[in-house]
């Protein structure tokens, strides 16, 4: 992991398309601004984990429904 120090209003550039700017620093919180192409998805880590968890739950429910349906068809 690369660790960099930046002050307020300073930026970090990733490749040719991404700029991360320190917008403000206040009471243990850092506000960041991101400039990136529209096709790039930018998510907070906890939101990405929540989406992945919901996808797993939905997949498990879908598998259960499919198995129940298949079981009923086999009984006929």
Swiss-Prot record:
<dbReference type="GO" id="GO:0045947">
    <property type="term" value="P:negative regulation of translational initiation"/>
</dbReference>
<dbReference type="Pfam" id="PF02599">
    <property type="entry name" value="CsrA"/>
</dbReference>
<keyword id="KW-0678">Repressor</keyword>
<dbReference type="GO" id="GO:0006402">
    <property type="term" value="P:mRNA catabolic process"/>
</dbReference>
<keyword id="KW-0810">Translation regulation</keyword>
<keyword id="KW-0694">RNA-binding</keyword>
<dbReference type="GO" id="GO:0005829">
    <property type="term" value="C:cytosol"/>
</dbReference>
<dbReference type="GO" id="GO:0006109">
    <property type="term" value="P:regulation of carbohydrate metabolic process"/>
</dbReference>
<comment type="subunit">
    <text>Homodimer; the beta-strands of each monomer intercalate to form a hydrophobic core, while the alpha-helices form wings that extend away from the core.</text>
</comment>
<keyword id="KW-0963">Cytoplasm</keyword>
<dbReference type="GO" id="GO:0048027">
    <property type="term" value="F:mRNA 5'-UTR binding"/>
</dbReference>
<keyword id="KW-1005">Bacterial flagellum biogenesis</keyword>
<comment type="function">
    <text>A translational regulator that binds mRNA to regulate translation initiation and/or mRNA stability. Usually binds in the 5'-UTR at or near the Shine-Dalgarno sequence preventing ribosome-binding, thus repressing translation. Its main target seems to be the major flagellin gene, while its function is anatagonized by FliW.</text>
</comment>
<dbReference type="GO" id="GO:1902208">
    <property type="term" value="P:regulation of bacterial-type flagellum assembly"/>
</dbReference>
<comment type="similarity">
    <text>Belongs to the CsrA/RsmA family.</text>
</comment>
<dbReference type="InterPro" id="IPR036107">
    <property type="entry name" value="CsrA_sf"/>
</dbReference>
<protein>
    <recommendedName>
        <fullName>Translational regulator CsrA</fullName>
    </recommendedName>
</protein>
<dbReference type="InterPro" id="IPR003751">
    <property type="entry name" value="CsrA"/>
</dbReference>
<dbReference type="GO" id="GO:0044781">
    <property type="term" value="P:bacterial-type flagellum organization"/>
</dbReference>
